[in-house]
Regions:
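N-terminal accessory segments that position/regulate proteins before the catalytic core
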Residues: 1-36, 40-48, 84, 92
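A glycine-rich helix N-cap at a beta->alpha junction
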Residues: 91-98, 184-207
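Short, basic and Ser/Thr-rich N-terminal targeting/leader segments
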Residues: 64-67, 119-121, 190
Length: 222
């Protein structure tokens, strides 16, 4: 075994009471998170976004390869280009690609091909999966469980942004290949999703939908 090991940093053994309190507090906070489609143009400090990305970067990953990249776009001309290309793909989706069943499932969310939030929100974060790494000499390094790892990191990023007081929306135009050119990402990376981040517009509304209960999403096996 050649691994270099160190003591677990900040190891704590909390009481059951403290752990229960913390877990309940986190649940109360995170259950207030909602996907928002009406974003304010109010500016958000870039340092807040950077801190949340740093939190995402602490996610576990296969063989610690950390196969993610977060490309940040503030408000500017690039955002208009992203919106135009994304809406083109969305129109194709709604008009020709989506099945009737899929469109029916989307009705409760009130979505359509118009994506104004791609311009109005202060930040877009293009999240990319590194299919493989590239060493300084140009050779390739295999990445393990890259998609799963980036999915976990994205979840942490969404939770961190919510904790900071910001709203988010996950957007996945299909196909997303145009994002590589816009965000200037290399061929070993492919788009995972676009994360919209900012303050919700005053008076913003969200669909009247519910999350599943504990009994519906979990089970006990003896």
């Amino acid at each position: 075994m050649n691994a270099k090991l160190i003591p677990l940093p900040n190891a704590k053994h909390l009481s059951d009471e403290e752990m229960k309190s913390r877990s309940e507090e986190f649940y109360r906070h995170i259950k207030q998170r909602r996907t928002v489609r009406d974003f304010s143009t109010e500016k958000v400090s870039r340092s807040i976004i950077d801190n949340c990305i740093l939190a995402a970067g602490t996610a576990p990953s296969g063989a610690n390869m950390q196969p993610w990249h977060f490309a940040v776009s503030g408000q500017g001309e690039t955002r208009k280009i992203i919106r135009e290309k994304a809406e083109k793909e969305e129109r194709d989706f709604y008009e020709t690609k989506a099945s009737a069943e899929w469109l029916k499932a989307l009705e409760a969310l009130g979505t359509d091909a118009n994506k104004p939030f791609l311009e109005t929100a202060p930040f877009l974060i293009g999240i990319f999966v590194k299919s493989y790494g590239i060493l300084p000499d140009g050779s390739q390094v295999k990445h393990y469980y890259a998609i799963e790892s980036v999915g976990i990191a994205t979840g942490i990023l969404i939770a961190a942004l919510h904790n900071a007081g910001l709203s988010t929306l996950t957007h996945t135009p299909s196909p997303m290949g145009f994002l590589n050119k816009i965000f200037k990402r290399p061929k070993n990376e492919r788009p995972f999703l676009l994360l919209v981040a900012g303050y919700a517009e005053k008076g913003a509304q969200v669909p009247d939908i519910q999350k599943m209960s504990l009994g519906e999403i979990s089970s006990d096996i003896s």
